[in-house]
Amino acid sequence: MSNFFKETDVDTSQAEASVTETLKNCDDGELYLENHKSESIVLDDNKIKSSTYNSDQGYGFRAVTGEVVAYSHSNDISKESLRKSSDNLKETLKSKKGTYNHEIPKTNSKYYENINPIESKTFDSKIDLLNSVNNYLRSKGSIVNQVTANFLGEHKSIEIIRSDNQVLKDDRPLVRFNVSVVLEKDGKKETGVYGVGGRQSYDDYLKDGS
């Protein structure tokens, strides 16, 4: 079963049936589902300054006939919500008729791994790494006045259901690690900043001894 329907009253086959029935007389369209999770952990002045986590999901239902485009969206993935969206689309396009274009060119190119960086490490291990960075930099001398380090992690899941039950999926990881250091000596301050990130897991950038 799709991850989008695990905690709802609708399953994949019901969603596919809704898409097929709604778009049967349309030129184009799809049900686009998206789930987005993000986290941020900031260490500053020898302590964890902030920690945030957000999670959102929803869908967009699109139907196209000729020059008319109908669109409905909701953050509630349920039978009733999909039914209302379907009714709204059909009402908008009821005077139009077309032939659905099923084909979508596929590249099947793999640009990044199918991973969830937020779940790839425990919260405690992320805190330990930030503390390790802080301790390492401060061990370089008393001129280290301030250290700020933070993790930023995102994971976005996308699923597109076409009227012929063709399902396209993509999981997009994104991580970033930033650190800034303020040095002070003889009343003079200097700041150094470094950052690294990409569509990978935390492990690709933060390893023991690195």
Where are the regions a protein language model picked out?
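Acidic low-complexity segments
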Residues: M1-T20, C26-S40, E80-D171, S201-S210
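Short, solvent-exposed coil/turn segments at beta-strand boundaries
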Residues: T22-L23, G66
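Generic structural motif
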Residues: H36, G66-V68, I77, E154-K156, ...
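N-terminal alpha-helical targeting/anchoring segments
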Residues: E39-K94
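Short capping/connector residues at structural and topological boundaries
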Residues: N46-I48, Y53, F123, N165, ...
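Short beta-strand elements
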Residues: T52-T65, L168-G197
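Low-complexity, flexible helical/coil segments
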Residues: T65-Y71, S95-Y100, T107-Y112, L183-K188
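Short, solvent-exposed aromatic-acidic interface loops
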Residues: I77, Y194-D203
